[in-house]
Amino acid sequence: VVIVVMRTADGTPVFPVTKRPSKMRAHPGQFALPGGSVDPGESSEQAAVRELSEELGVDVPESKIIGRLDDYVTRSGFVIRPFVMWSGEDIGGLVPNPDEVAQVYAVTSEELDVDSRFVTIAESPNPVIQWPFRTSLIHAPTGAVIYQFREVLNGRHTRIDKLEQPVFAWR
């Protein structure tokens, strides 16, 4: 997945978070960062660049990757490898793919810097993370990756491997 730092028309730094279409087979209606599977012969970095282009119409070269966050292993066994990229492009120029993106949100630094919630559940010894975003809660894995991005920006070395997904995402 990719957190790509862009800007608004007035120059405010933001990054896009998407909401998946309700008709999607996997995780319909959930919040997500651009990303997907690595194709044969492709590196994780190349996949991140390709998925960003396919989902949002943003063509950012691999050289614009400025960092990597911790891998997050989902309950279903997928390994999510998050990258942080710098684009600097106007987020208003996005061209979302309607097959993969129902809506795009521009996340500001003020929205990013909201304290996450950590909820105890009977099914796991690890806390479920809930990142409050506008009128919603974004859970792991997306919420965990965004949480770590916030922590890194604040100079904290916080790991996310012990942050749980909600039970509804365990499939």
Region spans (language model):
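Short, amphipathic alpha-helical segments that act as regulatory/interfacial helices
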Residues: I146-R150
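Unchanged
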Residues: S37-R134, I138, E151-V152, R156-R171
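N-terminal strand-loop-strand
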Residues: V1-L33
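Intrinsically disordered, low-complexity, charge-dense segments enriched in Lys/Arg
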Residues: P141-A144
